[in-house]
UniProtKB/Swiss-Prot annotation:
It comes from Saccharomyces cerevisiae (strain ATCC 204508 / S288c). It catalyses: a di-trans,poly-cis-dolichyl phosphate + GDP-alpha-D-mannose = a di-trans,poly-cis-dolichyl beta-D-mannosyl phosphate + GDP. This is Dolichol-phosphate mannosyltransferase. One of its GO terms (cellular component) is mitochondrion. GO terms for molecular function: dolichyl-phosphate beta-D-mannosyltransferase activity; metal ion binding. The keyword Membrane applies. The chain crosses the membrane at residues 239-259. It comes from the Eukaryota. The modification Phosphoserine is found at S141. InterPro entries: DPM1-like (IPR039528), Glyco_trans_2-like (IPR001173), Nucleotide-diphossugar_trans (IPR029044).
Amino acid sequence: MSIEYSVIVPAYHEKLNIKPLTTRLFAGMSPEMAKKTELIFVDDNSQDGSVEEVDALAHQGYNVRIIVRTNERGLSSAVLKGFYEAKGQYLVCMDADLQHPPETVPKLFESLHDHAFTLGTRYAPGVGIDKDWPMYRRVISSTARMMARPLTIASDPMSGFFGLQKKYLENCNPRDINSQGFKIALELLAKLPLPRDPRVAIGEVPFTFGVRTEGESKLSGKVIIQYLQQLKELYVFKFGANNLILFITFWSILFFYVCYQLYHLVF
């Protein structure tokens, strides 16, 4: 049976999460969907036993494989590597740390039957970020989301849990996509030739963002700087270099707003 669905998981030192992610993903699918699905880990040469872990799961009958990169690093380029090598026409990206529930993946694929691009959103009624998420992470996430608002109508453009129909990626010049940015979903939302009709362009699937169970968070000051640089490039791409002043003004207003909110949180 031909592959119709591909799940891409960028990974670095995530050996302990590979087995639970794989088993939960396929257990959450109907038998029919599972037969048409492949799982691809894109690993940046972790050398932590991830390759052996994936091979063991493949020998157990799971349709899973691993791509090991030795000359490249970075989340966005890893996602793109997996997308371009995927066999399916419906693609989903998710984190390896189980903060994106594998059981929700079938809902993203179902949404992709009706939409060009689908996002898992943490900002729908009744769901959201786990209550144990630190306040500073919530503030950073909300601020980043607000700064991306002029670029897309999506409620959660910062989500790393998303999917797309591969044909839209194939219709975009790879040179136009910044593979060094941190938020690849936002990059693709801004640059792919998605339908003009928002009803078919973007779908959203609510999910609750969980707490990492194994490994360490990749969030750092360097990542935040990369995101700000990516935002600048996307603003220029969408609005033109002459309107860069709008980006700077928006940044400044948002900066003072966040400082105000943090002041009241602390004092």
